């Protein structure tokens, strides 16, 4: 039995007057479903950093060493490396609704196991399951956004989704220790993380209903599994791509493995309190905690994420207009070095260094990820992004473990901060090599929209001659 012919897609400009305000072809419907698509990963972002946010309490109450905290992040990345090879294929096989629900449930199961765990192995098992679901869910979320916003407000939609997702991380760092102290148990805080994951599952059900309705009314594009690795494409990548990949590994390895134990470092080295002292109910204390974000250890850690939430969409728009992607990656890698060294070898207030890291975390990803389609052929972008994500997770798996082991071995965070500064040096080298390679390949990364448009017009004129 053949499928019925797809109905023509109704755009806002061609929609008949009889179509209602909340019709799937209308902007209000798209942005409402975008809200629920964005909330699919809110729980996973919250739960991912709940371990780092609670690190001092977990170390004290469970008698864990720092390397165990790092290992919990490593377990997540191991699952992420494996699942990146299958996530896109599962999406193609199951479709957007069933795939997103499956991965949301995996995230919930993993977070629940972590919250209920009574041994280290149960903690590791929970993080493995959580990582498998979370990384796949991020891939699926990107594919779903592309499905609904292709040819429309794509860049805006991705910016909104990232900002809403990062709210989970911001809340995790600024509420988890408070929840643990308020209820007298770290386990309640871990259950709060699982509750956020349950909330994402409920949002998934709303998304499923809206997507099903939209699919019945509109001829939505055929689901695309997103970033899938085709091994035959790998040998076709030029040097610029590989420098972007190496820069990606070194840069992210100097950020996320650092934040895994940054809360413990600020509390351990500077004696910065874990929560802001206040009275009243939990909500009242949480508001005070957010107001004094720069004066608590978890709040300082979240400065990087807060900067990304607020400024990343503007940075993306700016870079689209001016170009200079390789140059900005040089600058972003450069500032990592003094920021980490100052926190490692001095007792200066760490807030300025964290603000610098936040600025780097705004600039470099905004320049890095859009560079991939500029240095590889369009048909190989999926392989390029999938491979880059897999290699990135190698660093995100290795360096949290090294961070914890160095702290356990030396008794201070000086060696770990020097390690992160060295990653900044390596990233700076790769950024300069990328800049040189890009110049040899036409300087596409340095071009802004106006220059790209001008070159496109020249090429079109030459083709007509």
Regions found by a protein language model. Name each.
Residues 15-27, 211-245, 450-463:
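Juxtamembrane intracellular "pre-TM" segments in multi-pass secondary transporters
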Residues 51-55, 238-305, 309, 369, ...:
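Extracytoplasmic gate region of multi-pass secondary transporters
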Residues 63, 95, 116-122, 133, ...:
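Helix-breaking motifs and short loop linkers at transmembrane-helix boundaries and internal kinks
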Residues 82-121:
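Conserved MFS/SLC helix-loop-helix module at the cytosolic interface between two early adjacent transmembrane helices
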Residues 83-95, 311-324:
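Helix-to-loop junctions at the C-terminal end of transmembrane segments
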Residues 126-164:
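Cytoplasmic helix-loop-helix junction between adjacent transmembrane helices
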Residues 161-212:
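Helix-loop-helix hairpin linking two adjacent transmembrane segments in secondary transporters
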Residues 325-371:
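C-terminal transmembrane helical hairpin of 12-TM major facilitator-type secondary transporters
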């Amino acid at each position: 039995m053949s499928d019925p012919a797809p109905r023509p897609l109704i755009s806002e400009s061609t929609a008949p007057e009889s179509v209602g305000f909340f019709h799937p072809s209308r902007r209000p419907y798209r942005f409402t479903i975008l809200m629920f698509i964005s909330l699919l990963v809110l729980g996973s972002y919250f739960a991912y950093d709940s371990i780092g946010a609670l690190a001092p309490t977990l170390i004290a109450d469970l008698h864990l060493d720092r390397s165990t905290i790092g290992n919990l992040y490593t377990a997540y990345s191991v699952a992420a490396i494996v699942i990146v090879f299958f996530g896109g294929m599962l999406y193609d096989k199951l479709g957007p609704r069933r795939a997103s629900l499956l991965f949301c449930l995996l995230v919930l199961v993993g977070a629940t196991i972590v919250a209920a765990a009574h041994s280290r192995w149960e903690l590791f098992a929970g993080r493995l399951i959580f990582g498998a679901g979370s990384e796949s869910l991020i891939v699926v979320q990107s594919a779903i956004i592309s499905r609904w916003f292709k040819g429309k407000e794509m860049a805006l939609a991705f910016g909104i989704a990232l900002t809403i997702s990062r709210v989970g991380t911001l809340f995790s760092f600024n509420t988890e220790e408070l929840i643990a102290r308020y209820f007298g148990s770290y386990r309640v805080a871990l259950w709060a993380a699982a509750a956020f994951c349950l909330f994402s599952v409920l949002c998934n059900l709303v998304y499923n209903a809206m997507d099903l309705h939209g699919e019945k009314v509109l001829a939505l594009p055929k689901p695309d599994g997103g970033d899938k690795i085709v091994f035959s494409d790998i040998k076709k990548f030029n040097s610029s791509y590989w420098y972007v990949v190496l820069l990606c590994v070194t840069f992210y390895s100097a950020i996320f493995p650092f934040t895994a134990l940054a809360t413990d470092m600020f509390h351990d080295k500077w004696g910065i309190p874990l929560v802001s002292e206040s009275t009243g109910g939990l909500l009242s204390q949480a508001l005070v905690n957010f107001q004094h974000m720069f004066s608590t250890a978890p709040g300082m850690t979240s400065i990087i994420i807060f900067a990304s939430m607020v400024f990343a969409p503007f940075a993306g728009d700016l870079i689209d207009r001016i170009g200079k992607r390789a140059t900005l990656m040089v600058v972003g890698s450069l500032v990592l070095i003094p920021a980490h060294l100052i926190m490692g070898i001095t007792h200066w207030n760490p807030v300025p260094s964290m603000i610098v890291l936040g600025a780097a975390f705004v600039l470099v990803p905004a320049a890095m990820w859009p560079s991939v389609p500029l240095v590889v052929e369009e048909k190989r972008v999926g392989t390029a992004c999938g491979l880059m994500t897999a290699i990135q997770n190698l660093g995100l798996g290795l360096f949290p473990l090294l961070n914890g082991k160095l702290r356990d071995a030396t008794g201070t965070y000086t060696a770990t901060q020097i390690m992160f500064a060295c990653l900044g040096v390596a990233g700076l080298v790769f950024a300069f090599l990328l800049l040189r390679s890009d110049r040899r390949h036409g300087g596409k990364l340095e071009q802004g929209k106006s220059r790209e448009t001008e070159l496109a017009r020249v090429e079109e004129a030459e083709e007509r001659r």
